[in-house]
């Protein structure tokens, strides 16, 4: 995890000098050049990593489970596909960067940034006025756009798709913000309230974008235009296609491959060997169906394995001042996707035959 974060940070610093100083002056920043980017780069790296971790959570029991190869987005080797899943990776990574920058700004981690008090004193609605310390989402959005969108240098349909989904991620941060209020009045009568906007939990943003992923729109596009945006005609046609979609919606251009199957060229491991859930407390219906989705619907069987877990238990405090625990063993039953026995036997036979030929 730490190595991944450092790799993201190093790559961002490599690409940062391509931003122009004029872009910074427009936004009234106190610094220009590489120093300014260094100020925010640590937050950007953490935000990108948080986005990937949220992706793994949201897709933990899906056939595509946000594998490590998705980090190619942050390192700008490029997610070559333009699938529904790619759209989510761009959106959640962009949201993660904006979220972390906004939160760090409100916490006073940056010298040139603080709370958003631009609306303070204005009447917000019946019985309440704007006040307090609103999270500065505008700042987070602006810096996130410079860093994340700045990595997208192409002009073809795939590049525009990535930029659109980056923006959808930032909009998700703003759309999920919550109004928090404090009451004022004699003896707590709450005759008037002072309210401010706060960031939602990042899990709420992940849930929001997961729904957007499930409802993502496919844009039908000429494959030649997807690869080439150089001509004015191509750029115009691509721009027209994108303009019909709301900025908060996720879009994709290509159908997803079969994630049941292993495909080395695409970096897909398939679902064989994946764990699934059949029983347990507080499982959602989606989680309970994971064995069907990952195993049986992919032509695999569900294999039951018993695992022994050793953990501390019956801990007691002894004066003074130690805690002594017993070591307890617990057998846990887990379920995994495995090949059907007939398929495994056929595979073993083929391997033996190859061995004899050698």
From Swiss-Prot:
<dbReference type="InterPro" id="IPR018161">
    <property type="entry name" value="Wnt_CS"/>
</dbReference>
<feature type="glycosylation site" description="N-linked (GlcNAc...) asparagine">
    <location>
        <position position="104"/>
    </location>
</feature>
<dbReference type="InterPro" id="IPR043158">
    <property type="entry name" value="Wnt_C"/>
</dbReference>
<keyword id="KW-0325">Glycoprotein</keyword>
<dbReference type="GO" id="GO:0000578">
    <property type="term" value="P:embryonic axis specification"/>
</dbReference>
<dbReference type="GO" id="GO:0030182">
    <property type="term" value="P:neuron differentiation"/>
</dbReference>
<feature type="disulfide bond">
    <location>
        <begin position="295"/>
        <end position="337"/>
    </location>
</feature>
<keyword id="KW-0964">Secreted</keyword>
<feature type="lipid moiety-binding region" description="O-palmitoleoyl serine">
    <location>
        <position position="187"/>
    </location>
</feature>
<dbReference type="Pfam" id="PF00110">
    <property type="entry name" value="wnt"/>
</dbReference>
<feature type="site" description="Cleavage; by tiki1 and tiki2">
    <location>
        <begin position="42"/>
        <end position="43"/>
    </location>
</feature>
<feature type="disulfide bond">
    <location>
        <begin position="105"/>
        <end position="113"/>
    </location>
</feature>
<feature type="disulfide bond">
    <location>
        <begin position="183"/>
        <end position="190"/>
    </location>
</feature>
<protein>
    <recommendedName>
        <fullName>Protein Wnt-8</fullName>
    </recommendedName>
</protein>
<dbReference type="GO" id="GO:0005615">
    <property type="term" value="C:extracellular space"/>
</dbReference>
<comment type="function">
    <text>Ligand for members of the frizzled family of seven transmembrane receptors. Plays a role in ventral mesodermal patterning during embryogenesis. Mimics Nieuwkoop center activity. Causes dorsal mesodermal differentiation of animal cap ectoderm when coexpressed with noggin and nuclear, sequence-specific DNA-binding protein xBra. None of these molecules causes dorsal mesoderm formation when expressed alone.</text>
</comment>
<dbReference type="GO" id="GO:0007498">
    <property type="term" value="P:mesoderm development"/>
</dbReference>
<keyword id="KW-0732">Signal</keyword>
<feature type="disulfide bond">
    <location>
        <begin position="260"/>
        <end position="298"/>
    </location>
</feature>
<dbReference type="GO" id="GO:0014034">
    <property type="term" value="P:neural crest cell fate commitment"/>
</dbReference>
<keyword id="KW-0449">Lipoprotein</keyword>
<feature type="disulfide bond">
    <location>
        <begin position="320"/>
        <end position="321"/>
    </location>
</feature>
<keyword id="KW-0879">Wnt signaling pathway</keyword>
<feature type="disulfide bond">
    <location>
        <begin position="313"/>
        <end position="328"/>
    </location>
</feature>
<feature type="disulfide bond">
    <location>
        <begin position="181"/>
        <end position="195"/>
    </location>
</feature>
<dbReference type="GO" id="GO:0005125">
    <property type="term" value="F:cytokine activity"/>
</dbReference>
<dbReference type="InterPro" id="IPR005817">
    <property type="entry name" value="Wnt"/>
</dbReference>
<dbReference type="GO" id="GO:0045944">
    <property type="term" value="P:positive regulation of transcription by RNA polymerase II"/>
</dbReference>
<dbReference type="InterPro" id="IPR034312">
    <property type="entry name" value="Protein_Wnt-8A/8C"/>
</dbReference>
<feature type="disulfide bond">
    <location>
        <begin position="55"/>
        <end position="66"/>
    </location>
</feature>
<feature type="signal peptide">
    <location>
        <begin position="1"/>
        <end position="22"/>
    </location>
</feature>
<dbReference type="GO" id="GO:0060061">
    <property type="term" value="P:Spemann organizer formation"/>
</dbReference>
<dbReference type="GO" id="GO:0016055">
    <property type="term" value="P:Wnt signaling pathway"/>
</dbReference>
<comment type="subunit">
    <text>Homooligomer; disulfide-linked, leading to inactivation. Interacts with the long chain of cer1.</text>
</comment>
<dbReference type="GO" id="GO:0060322">
    <property type="term" value="P:head development"/>
</dbReference>
<dbReference type="GO" id="GO:0002020">
    <property type="term" value="F:protease binding"/>
</dbReference>
<feature type="glycosylation site" description="N-linked (GlcNAc...) asparagine">
    <location>
        <position position="282"/>
    </location>
</feature>
<dbReference type="GO" id="GO:0005109">
    <property type="term" value="F:frizzled binding"/>
</dbReference>
<feature type="glycosylation site" description="N-linked (GlcNAc...) asparagine">
    <location>
        <position position="263"/>
    </location>
</feature>
<dbReference type="GO" id="GO:0009948">
    <property type="term" value="P:anterior/posterior axis specification"/>
</dbReference>
<dbReference type="GO" id="GO:0060070">
    <property type="term" value="P:canonical Wnt signaling pathway"/>
</dbReference>
<comment type="similarity">
    <text>Belongs to the Wnt family.</text>
</comment>
